[in-house]
Every structure is written in C-alpha cells, then in structure tokens.
C-alpha cells in the first residue's frame, strides 16, 4: 500500500497543508500539534502561551508548502533552524519534505532530533520508523513504531506500520497481531483500510495458521472498498479473478508494485516458489519504492537467499 495514510504520513500532511485554505499564522502551531500527533502533555507545555509566536521564516515556509514549492519551503525551514535548532514546527516541516523527496537518512535524522526533544511525539516516532523502514533498518523501525503506538494507541496507521515491519522481519505471528489491532483502531475512528487485512491474511499463512488466514480473507471480502483499489487484489486472493486480470486493473506504478507483490505472495503460499520469485524479484528490481510492498518484497528475497545459504 502507499505509505501515506490520512494525517499520519508525511506526504499526506504536506497535501493537507497545500489544500488547507484557511491556514493562518496564529493556528499554525496548534494545527501542527493536533495533526502531527504531539502528546497532550507536550501540547499543554508548548501552548501555555495563549498567543504562540511563530518564526516568520517558518510561517513563510508553510505558506510555500501550501503553494506547492517544497524546495523553497525547505530553504526557509533550514534558515529557521539555524536560528533555533529545536524549533518544532521547522523540524517537522523539514522532516516532511525530506521524506517526500525520499531523502530518508536526512528525514530520519530530523525526526530523531524531534523525539530527542519531544520524546512523546507520536507522529515523529512514526516518521522516524518510516525513514528507518525505507532504509531497511527494520530493528530501528520496529522500536520507533512501538514508541508511536505507545504514545498514540488509537491510531490504525501506527499499528499498520508495525505490522509491515514485523512482516519484513519474518515475525509473522506478531505481524498478524499488529494488523488485527490496526483494523480495530481504524474502525474505532471510523476509518477504513483493507491493507491490515491483507497483511493479516499472508502473515497467518506464513505462520501456517490457515483458519485465521481464511477468516481474515473472508472479512476482507465482506468489507472491501467498492470499485476502488485494492478491491481487485481481494478478488484475486478470493479466487474470483486470475493474476493477469489483476494486472489489468493496474493504473499506476504503486498499484503495479502491489499487484505483483500479492501475486507473488499467493504463489509463495501455494508452494510455487519459482513463479512467486519471478513476481517478487520484479518488485525488488522495478517496484515503486514509495509503497510498503516494495520493501517487503526485497526483505522476503533476502530471507530466502539467506535460507539457501544456511547449512
């Protein structure tokens, strides 16, 4: 699935800023804290001044983001950070832009700086985890996602992120459990995402728990999105369409990456390793790096290669 999800992901936050027509200077900090996941305790500390003063450079940077000029916005955020390297709004803006540009090491360093100063900032922990995940540092990603869920437990995307990294680590039972919680948390907030159900399905299959795998797939079929992706993926897994038909529904590189990944995972579960590897290797070489499935395919390929080298 694409990494963005509502307000819990950097790209979607940038999109929201771009489309937030009533974005005003005096609401900037409180908007950033409420949208980006600062804990209630830290919100109370930072917002104790009834009229928080915003660095004009940061204000201008967010205005530039709203206009879609992320390059100039980044310059303004960095100028603001030369004046105050702990400016939360500037750090968040810089981190979001680095993530959007796939400059993952710099995004990680920025989010790491945020959690060093604001250790209960759930969004920053999740952003730190996403950056580590994209660099395939799964242990660091795991620890970061666990921190995010601890600080903001009613957040489906944080648990979904946790499930993805557990899949990449080969911890399939833990991945299934995190995916199950993700679905519950999405439902609690009136949100929907089919991806935790897909994760749970394959995690249970990898853990050889066919009953729970089938239950996850049945639930996905009953609750699949109408006439929108990834509904064709669910139809494929349920046996209603074949692989070439699934590919026929693809409209962009992210969907193509997902389609090949799920075809590969299904073939893998059926024991057809050669056919599965063709799809997973295609994803690892040609897939869209912006989606979780790209990294999962690479991780599974590595696990299989290491297994072959084991005595």
Where are these regions (language model features)?
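Alpha-helical segment of the N-proximal tetratricopeptide repeat
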Residues: 52-83, 93-100, 259-266
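Register position in tetratricopeptide repeats
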Residues: 66-67, 100-101, 134-135, 168-169, ...
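Helix-start (N-cap) detector for alpha-helical repeat units in TPR-like alpha-solenoids
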Residues: 53-54, 88-89, 122-123, 156-157, ...
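Residue-level recognition of tetratricopeptide repeat
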Residues: 62, 96, 130, 164, ...
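Structural marker of alpha-solenoid helical repeat scaffolds
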Residues: 83, 117, 151, 185-189, ...
């Amino acid at each position: 699935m694409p990494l963005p999800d509502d307000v819990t992901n950097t790209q979607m936050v940038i999109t929201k800023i771009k489309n937030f027509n009533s974005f005003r200077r005096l609401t900037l900090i409180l908007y950033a804290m409420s949208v980006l996941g600062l804990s209630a305790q830290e919100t109370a500390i930072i917002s104790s001044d009834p009229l928080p003063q915003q660095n004009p450079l940061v204000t201008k940077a967010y205005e530039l983001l709203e206009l879609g000029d992320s390059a100039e916005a980044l310059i303004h955020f960095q100028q603001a950070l030369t004046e105050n390297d702990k400016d939360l709004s500037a750090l968040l803006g810089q981190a979001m832009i680095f993530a959007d540009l796939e400059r993952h090491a710099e995004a990680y360093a920025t989010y790491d700086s945020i959690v060093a100063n604001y250790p209960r900032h759930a969004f920053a922990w999740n952003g730190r985890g996403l950056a580590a995940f994209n660099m395939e540092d799964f242990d660091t990603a795991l620890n970061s996602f666990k921190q995010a869920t601890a600080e903001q437990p009613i957040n489906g995307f944080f648990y979904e992120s946790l499930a993805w990294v557990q899949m990449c680590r080969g911890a399939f039972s833990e991945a299934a459990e995190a995916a199950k919680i993700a679905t519950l948390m999405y439902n609690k907030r009136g949100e929907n995402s089919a991806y935790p159900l897909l994760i749970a399905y394959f995690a249970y299959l990898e853990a050889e728990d066919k009953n729970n795998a089938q239950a996850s797939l049945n639930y996905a079929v009953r609750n699949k999105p109408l006439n929108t992706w990834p509904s064709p993926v669910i139809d494929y897994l349920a046996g209603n369409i074949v692989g070439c038909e699934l590919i026929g529904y693809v409209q962009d590189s992210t969907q193509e990456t997902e389609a090949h990944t799920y075809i590969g995972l299904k073939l893998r579960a059926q024991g057809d390793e050669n056919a599965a590897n063709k799809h997973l290797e295609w994803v690892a070489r040609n897939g869209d790096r912006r989606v979780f499935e790209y990294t999962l395919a690479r991780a599974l390929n590595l696990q299989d290669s290491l297994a072959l080298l084991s005595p």
